[in-house]
């Protein structure tokens, strides 16, 4: 019920920001912001806390910030391209940040 109310409030107050929607992700305090071609996971309680990267009123990262959380997000900014976000394990290779996402894309190549 809370999740539906938050979506309605966001869409009613910011009708031209309809490209972002809040989705429940299992726990009442865990939400995801969905942008075109991008999903950013909000940390637990971000919707009702003073998280430094999150603007809960606008339902997205604060102005000038790139991300809220993720393996390629530090201090509200994407990590530089080529930063290792997952070290090699077994016959797998390192995975690297792209510089344009907070996600850690899987390296499809093997040694």
From Swiss-Prot:
Its main subcellular localisation, reduced to a broad class, is secreted
Which Gene Ontology molecular function entries are recorded, alphabetically? toxin activity
Q: Mind telling me which Gene3D superfamilies this protein's record contains?
A: Disintegrin domain (4.10.70.10)
Propeptide found at: 21-46, 110-111
Domain Disintegrin stretches: 26-111
Signal peptide span per the entry? 1-20
Q: In which tissues is it expressed?
A: Expressed by the venom gland.
The keyword Secreted is assigned to this record = yes
Q: Which PROSITE patterns match?
A: DISINTEGRIN_1 (PS00427), DISINTEGRIN_2 (PS50214)
Entry superkingdom = Eukaryota
An example of a Gene Ontology cellular component annotation for this protein is: extracellular region
Q: List the InterPro entries.
A: Disintegrin_CS, Disintegrin_dom, Disintegrin_dom_sf
Which residue numbers does the motif Cell attachment site cover?
A: 89-91
Q: Where in the cell is it found?
A: Secreted
SS bond partners? 53-76, 67-73, 72-97, 85-104
Q: Which UniProt keywords apply?
A: Cell adhesion impairing toxin, Disulfide bond, Hemostasis impairing toxin, Platelet aggregation inhibiting toxin, Secreted, Signal, Toxin
UniProt key word Amino-acid biosynthesis: no
PANTHER family named in the record: ADAM A DISINTEGRIN AND METALLOPROTEASE DOMAIN, ADAM METALLOPROTEASE
Q: Which function does this protein serve?
A: Poor inhibitor of platelet aggregation. The disintegrin inhibits the adhesion of cells expressing the RGD-dependent integrin alpha-5/beta-1 (ITGA5/ITGB1) to immobilized fibronectin. Inhibition on alpha-IIb/beta-3 (ITGA2B/ITGB3) is low.
Spell out the subunit comment.
Heterodimer; disulfide-linked.
The Swiss-Prot or TrEMBL record describes its family as follows: Belongs to the disintegrin family. Dimeric disintegrin subfamily.
Under which name does UniProt file this protein? Disintegrin Eo1 subunit 1
* Native organism: Echis ocellatus
């Amino acid at each position: 019920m809370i999740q539906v109310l938050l979506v309605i409030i966001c869409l009613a107050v910011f009708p031209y920001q309809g490209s972002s929607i809040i989705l429940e992700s299992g726990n009442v305090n865990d939400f995801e912001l969905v942008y075109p071609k991008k999903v950013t996971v909000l940390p637990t309680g971000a919707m009702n806390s003073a998280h430094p990267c999150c603007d809960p009123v606008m339902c997205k990262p604060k102005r000038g910030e790139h991300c809220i959380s993720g393996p390629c997000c530090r201090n509200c900014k994407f990590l530089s391209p080529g930063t290792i976000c997952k070290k090699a394990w077994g016959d797998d290779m390192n995975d690297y940040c792209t510089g344009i996402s907070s996600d850690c894309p899987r390296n499809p190549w093997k040694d």
